[in-house]
Amino acid sequence: MELRTFNAMAPLHVMHYQNSSIEEVADWNLFRRQLKESKKMGIDGISVDVWWGMVEKDGDNIFHWEYYQKIFSEIISNGLEIIPILSFHSFDPGPNSAFRAPIPNWVWKYLAEKSGLNEIDLKYISEEKGKDDALLYSDEFVSLWADEWVMPQYSEFMEEFLREFQNDLDSFQEINISCGPTGELRYPSYSSHDGGSYPNRGRMQCFSKPAIQNYREYLKADSFIHPSELISELEKGNYSDHGVERLLKWYNLSLMNHGNRMLKECIRIFPETIPIGFKIPGIHWKIADPETPRIAEITCGLIDGTEMNGEGAYSNSLRMVLKDLPLERIILHFTCLEQNNSDLNSDSVKHFSRAKDLVYDVSSASKNIGIKIKGENSLSQNLRHEEAWFRIQSAIEHGNYSGLTIMRLNDVTFGNKLGNQEYSRIIRQF
């Protein structure tokens, strides 16, 4: 039987940036204690966000690796492996946050110059409009329709990372690549900047100039209907309408092709001994909505609405994202292992969630395609409930999951006694 891996996520950033050296020392001391406890529990590795917005914040090709030299050294010295996440997405809760890592300011200016577009058109623009018809956009991730200009920047970052940590490669369990907001292959359809959020349907994100131009090219000689004219049919769940069907196929294909480009670059740059991982989110609400089934997954770009069976829908998408790639090198990470289905009595309250079904559908899809899948929890607060741990255990035992990553380290060490006990028990069992 194949060995499973049991990992935990490091904090977003060790130390709080409040100009207190005492606080910094305390944070690093706590992190060291967490690492020692992790090793004792049998945890294999620690995943670490390598923030683009931190490393290259000062300008093109000006890299700051000191923090990562330190944190990697701490992890290795405790006998643990590292799972670097090349985090090209933004983490920016706002100016008063203890830690921020927005996409570097210079990136938007650089891409605008290269492309001839304005900065807003390099971002995902929503179907929704603001006051006085203002465009609503997300700057969590550079739009996939700007890949032509931003991909060389991603490649430079990867190559520089490889040079900097050449001597640590043996300690890398795998390298993960961020393909969208929060590091996941998706559109920012529920990021709350435009009214799209859990548990509603989400918002389509294909209204920038390069997106519309790309859609026109996709249609070729077929008649063009602007996406804004199709939203009302989408909201009715009329996915088989000719215009809606074409739009959703293109929308899903565009995202999967973007994921393929990102993975292809990783495969090209990093040694073949290192597996490459990517993540898709568990968009579990609205799956069983009788009027608009699976609409939240559709606006997120994960599926195209032609196939309502979860296993089939995700098999179709995975085939696209993994086209012409060496499957033996790639690991899919999927979130929401700890969540349950809503039932018929609670469906309207729990938003027609089929989280548990989705966990098994996506694992079956990965098995169909022939790639390894590992799981994650989606919310740390769920780890305070025993039944969540039983669902995680069941997914590993009866699903196709070959590993688990818990978000975050504190939730299985000193911040959650139940989490510490249950993760230790699961690791011992497997």
Each PLM stretch: what is its role?
Residues 11-15, 51-53, 87-91, 177-182, ...:
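Active-site beta-loop-alpha junctions enriched in small/polar residues
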Residues 28-125, 152-169, 173, 193-196, ...:
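Aromatic-lined substrate-binding rim segments of carbohydrate-active enzymes
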Residues 19-25, 58, 87, 94-99, ...:
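Short, solvent-exposed loop/turn and secondary-structure capping segments
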Residues 24-34, 62-71, 148-160, 254-264, ...:
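Well-ordered, non-membrane alpha-helical segments in soluble/globular domains
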Residues 1-38, 49:
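Boundary/entry segment of secreted carbohydrate-active catalytic domains
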Residues 3-9, 45-47, 79-85, 172-176, ...:
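Structural preference for beta-strand elements that scaffold enzyme active sites
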Residues 109-323:
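Polysaccharide-binding and catalytic clefts of secreted carbohydrate-active enzymes
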Residues 81-83, 87-91, 310-430:
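Substrate-binding cleft of secreted/luminal carbohydrate-active enzymes
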